[in-house]
Amino acid sequence: MTMSFINQKLKIYAVAVLGSGMFLACAQTKTTVASKTSKETSQSGKVVPTNLKWSERMMLSEMQRFPEAWMLDFSKSPKWTYPSAIVLDGAEQLYIKTGKQEYYDYISEFGEKLIKEDGTILTYDIEKYNIDMLNSGNVLLYLYEKEKKEKYLKALQTLRLQIDGQPRTNEGSFWHKKIYPYQVWLDGLYMGMPFYTHYTKDFTKGADAAKAYNDIVFQFDSVQKNLLDKKTGLLYHAWDESKKEAWANKETGLSPNFWGRAMGWYGMAMVDVLDYLPENHPGRARIISYIRSYSDAVIKYQDKKSGLWYQVLDKPLANGNYEEATASAMFVYTMIKSVNKGYLPKSYKAAAKKGYDGIIKNLITVDENGVVNLNKCCAVAGLGGKPYRDGSYEYYVNEEIRSNDGKGTGPFILASLEFEK
């Protein structure tokens, strides 16, 4: 009995020693990995290497700030919204360009998080008919192309159903949201039309496709007709067909100011839609002509010294106005992509490059660890709602300004990729 007790104690001791050894080995392994990681960090000295091109530097900085893509635009919990898709467009192009798996994983994890196995889109409500909600469909189009997961197809079909039910003005333009009746916002062209065109190219055939393409081009024709100011060449932020909104001019239905980012959205909408609109569609030539007149107007309001654009485009000297990052990045992207695609003559590259250099010189800062920041971004601006947004000059210049807004970092990545071609 005594020997049995001693043997049992010896076994326990042996297990303890073995366990300690395993623990020590694990601890040593972890220490080695930690030591190696800290050594690599100390050798490079940077979380984001400074020898990379600006597109990757900004993308990696966003991934550092927002480890999961649903966090982009400072989201506190996963929700279906539009800003993530702009940055993920850059991630997609960087993955195609570099083959680095981390970019694809960042996109893929967004889809996994936001789309349930039955194809339900997290936090999305089709009945709101909010055109903003279509933009992230572009991410799903890419993921479905790559992974062919049924849940992505179901989610895409749901978003396409929204287009069928989206309320319209009497002449056929999409309302921006169901809660904003008869209102067309420039923002909505970017939020809805690239997705609508891309979906049509991938999934719609024959007469249905022709009808959809005509509908898409009509949205731009209608905006040119109803929102364009012929004197400046700029387009107003929004138009109320009913002329009932307090912000709307009682004769024209137009909002009172030229908001930089609204114009930015519109430019990106045109240049991105052309990626999917058939080459033989007669509407292509019209949209290209709109890009030309749009760019001419934008260049007129580019600051001669900095190369940047103001929050309210036509009032650079007014009290409180400022050179704003998101609009500046969007204008640069629209013009340089248009030059690269042949929609604009090469002479327009100078204005785009001046704007791009102006962003880097005046709006970009780099932390000691290499993380890149884009400053002076307007966080949000809109019309109507609660509290009521009246579209006045004072309203636009007093909205929150912040750094690293996805509505600026995304277009900056995309513009950088165009300059790096």
Tell me what each language-model feature is.
Residues 49-71, 105-123, 154-173, 213-239, ...:
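Long, well-ordered core segments of solenoidal/helical folds
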Residues 40-85, 97-104, 113-131, 137, ...:
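CBM-like carbohydrate-recognition segments
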